[in-house]
């Protein structure tokens, strides 16, 4: 079996310096790992992504892809965990557009990375704890971490109509989409819209609202009232069970866990169906595509989808019963995989195309304008083709996506005294979702043996999704380092968490190896003395 090391492995902070982060364009067969070692991608590999298994043609310039038989793994890893040591997620800078750090010398000290990354997870914690609801920013400490309205640059009060915006622009956009909106600019349609002059031209203000991504359908699911209504729809059985437990002095966590265990697989699948986030719209870049315009559209889309992903995770039964830190760490570990498996599901009925959004559909060759992304497009198309061959059903997809979230981290989540309880809760959740997937497959009417084979085939593809996710993360970090595209707030937090996690993994790995070497040296000295 051929051994192939990833060209962009993460071994130290210096590997993300701009001078070293260029991902080469490869035109040979693309490899899929059969095992992962930490965050360095040292794995044995086998040919998987080649034109022989793709449902689209490859241009003649890549004819060297056609050689070699397709070999499948005999023992692929299923739901392989991410690297162990996850470290703190970054918080925001004071601008809505957060640009990458300036270039640094590759000879910089390894410890300097810890000074470039903030040490808390304020945005993700705020959203998970339910404070993503529109609320004004009042305290001086809160203003340091505030979002800014992309229309007028005032402080944003919340997430309105698909973007972070201030109360003034939110109200203006609401009036415009509900009533009179045939505004006319008295000048040249290029008026400056800022905090002081936002009322000077309604036409240019509305145009800028649309340019930054405000959409009519992007409001209802973010509103507090929506969540209140959803909570009021709880079944009478659950309310009765909770009230009875309180009268008897029972513990709420145990009762909520009991409620989860009483959910049938069918009810759990229906809950996952209701939790599905809405489609996110993003404007297609103008032709011809450039590296900057393509990456700008993709990062804007990812940032919007991350907001919806948090709401989706909180609606999975039992997820909010985990500690806030555990919720943060699980999302940090799997966000790219969740985005990519969602992309594959949207693209499953469109061979040769990637449906990033309803208004952003890309062909394989359209990725040529972005250095290093063509390889990722090929891997996405190949894995989507495999899901298409399996005739992946929507309910199966819902269960698989939830399993990616719940199985995304195998290292100790909570503190030492809470580790056993946290692990038990997470295992209980994962078992419930796995049972739901088994139930969905059994409902298809195939034989027991075919059910087992189908379950194995679906789970085996998750290691491919993990591999593509790692490649996508490395590519995005490279684009950020080269200042090709600005990286937005929540997306920046996730990227910084990934970078710091890989840095600490490499440091801990080197420390372990040095300790082991010293122990071996001591042992050899003792043997010689004897």
Swiss-Prot record:
It comes from Rattus norvegicus (Rat). Composed of three domains: a modulating N-terminal domain, a DNA-binding domain and a C-terminal ligand-binding domain. Phosphorylation at Ser-87 and Ser-105 recruits NCOA1. Expressed in the CA1 region of the hippocampus, expression decreases with age (at protein level). Expressed in prostate, ovary, lung, liver, kidney, fat, bone, brain, uterus and testis. Residues 1-148 are annotated as: Modulating. The keyword Zinc applies. InterPro entries: ER-beta-like_N, ER-beta/gamma, Est_rcpt/est-rel_rcp, NHR-like_dom_sf, Nucl_hrmn_rcpt_lig-bd, Nuclear_hormone_rcpt_NR3, Nuclear_hrmn_rcpt, Znf_hrmn_rcpt. Residues 264-498 form the NR LBD domain. One of its GO terms (cellular component) is perinuclear region of cytoplasm. The lineage of its organism: Eukaryota, Metazoa, Chordata, Craniata, Vertebrata. Residues 149-214 bind DNA. Residues 506-515 have a biased composition (Low complexity). One of its GO terms (biological process) is response to human chorionic gonadotropin. PANTHER family: KNIRPS-RELATED PROTEIN-RELATED. Keywords: Activator, DNA-binding, Glycoprotein, Lipid-binding, Metal-binding, Nucleus, Phosphoprotein, Receptor, Steroid-binding, Transcription, Transcription regulation, Zinc, Zinc-finger. One of its GO terms (molecular function) is nuclear steroid receptor activity. Residues 506-530 are annotated as: Disordered. Glycans are attached at residue 61. The modification Phosphoserine is found at residues 61, 87, 105. CDD domains: NR_DBD_ER (cd07171), NR_LBD_ER (cd06949). This is Estrogen receptor beta.
